[in-house]
Design a protein with these regions (language model features):
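NAD(P)H dinucleotide-binding glycine-rich loop of Rossmann-like/cofactor-binding domains
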Residues: 69, 94-167
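Cytochrome P450 core scaffold surrounding the K-helix E-X-X-R motif
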Residues: 29-35, 104
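Charged, glycine/proline-rich intrinsically disordered loops and linkers
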Residues: 1, 38-62, 106-131
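Residues that mark the start of a beta-strand
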Residues: 19, 92, 166-167, 193
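Short glycine/threonine/proline-enriched tight-turn/helix- or strand-capping micro-motif at secondary-structure
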Residues: 2-9
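Glycine-rich beta-strand-centered segment in the early N-terminal region that forms part
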Residues: 11-26, 37-100
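N-terminal Rossmann-fold NAD(P) dinucleotide-binding loop
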Residues: 177-178
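Adenosine-nucleotide cofactor-binding segment
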Residues: 170-173, 185-197
Length: 197
């Protein structure tokens, strides 16, 4: 879905999908910066630009930066074949896969916090069975959850893919890169090589 120009966020969901009632988006910082600067930091223009992207692409995939972000929302429906049996309708989750590959339809865009890359929003998103997510505890503030989850997708994928004896090289040693290096070492144990550049 990521290289696709447009995704189909139409309902109903399929049996192996999860429907999320969107509460907020956390855009990739480069995407937020590009939108803010191109709109002169004007809230109304930024809201319109984000709405235009989502309407035209069926996902939040900034065509200039190529990046997305993550979202927080409540589980609205669980497909009969969705693989996680611990979820129930109403649970609050944060996606750990990019908005650039998450089918998304917005019905409203509220306040935008450029410094935090946060966009208050309403609508729905569809998470595929392969999509990673985190179920959020009730006592964890959403702002904190988004900051943590925004970089957690990459390490989650590394943890699933890295195997003992492999050579894993991570390009970029920012927050996501360092966490990915730790995940690789955890998955491989003491065998294999972990390289960070």
């Amino acid at each position: 879905p990521q290289p696709a120009e447009r995704l189909d966020p139409s309902l109903p969901i399929r049996a192996n999908e999860l429907l999320i009632a969107v509460e907020a988006l956390n855009l990739d910082s480069s995407s937020m910066r590009q939108i803010a600067e191109s709109c002169g930091h004007d809230q109304a223009r930024m809201q319109a630009r984000i709405g235009d992207i989502v309407r035209s692409r069926g996902k939040m995939h900034n065509p200039v930066t190529g990046s997305g972000g993550v979202l927080i929302g409540r589980v609205a429906e669980i497909g009969a074949e969705f693989p996680d049996c611990d979820l129930k309708v109403g649970d609050v989750i944060c996606t750990l896969v990019s908005l650039s590959l998450t089918p998304l339809a917005l019905t409203g865009i509220g306040a935008i916090d450029v410094a935090a890359s946060r966009v208050e929003a309403s609508g729905h998103a569809i998470l595929f069975a392969s999509g990673l997510f985190a179920k959020l505890p009730a006592d964890l503030p959403q702002q904190t959850a988004m900051a943590l989850c925004d970089v957690a997708g990459a390490p989650g994928h590394v943890l699933k893919m890295a195997q003992p004896g492999q050579i894993v090289c991570v390009l970029g040693t920012g927050r996501a890169g360092l966490l990915s290096l730790c995940a690789a070492r955890q998955a491989m144990g003491q065998s294999g090589t972990v390289i960070g550049l």
